[in-house]
């Protein structure tokens, strides 16, 4: 499936973020792709996310099959990779500050990485503070 997003989109920064926090046996980052196991609607599936070569979004594959499970994976991926961020608005606000404006030149399209569920996000936050 193809998920669109507004440009710019800094896939490499997101991938680096997830690579540094990948849970062994659950997630991996390799060959410009993010992969993970996931439970959707009570079924186990493998999700792979990679950039669309056309540059206008992400390609997501999933072993969940069809229907509601695929829709759930699409929604999760949109959240995890922050695909619906209002980039123009964000950049406009950041550009109003001289220091942040300078950073936009080298960090344009940065997104806020999410998590596949609230429990996972909580555990990552707690462990991140401990390390």
Task: Write out the residue ranges for each language-model feature.
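HhH-family (HhH-GPD) DNA N-glycosylase catalytic core used in base-excision repair
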Residues: 1-131
């Amino acid at each position: 499936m193809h998920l669109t997003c507004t440009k710019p989109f800094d896939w490499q920064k997101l991938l680096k973020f997830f690579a540094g926090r990948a849970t062994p046996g659950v997630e991996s980052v390799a060959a410009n792709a993010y992969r993970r196991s996931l439970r959707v609607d009570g079924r186990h599936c493998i999700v792979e996310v990679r950039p669309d070569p056309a540059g206008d979004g992400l390609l997501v594959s999933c072993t969940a099959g069809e229907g509601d499970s695929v829709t759930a994976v699409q929604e999760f991926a949109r959240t995890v990779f922050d695909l619906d961020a209002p980039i123009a608005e964000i950049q406009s606000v950041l550009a109003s500050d001289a220091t942040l404006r300078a950073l936009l030149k080298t960090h344009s399209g940065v997104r806020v990485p999410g998590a596949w569920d609230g429990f996972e996000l909580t555990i990552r936050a707690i462990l991140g503070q401990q390390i």
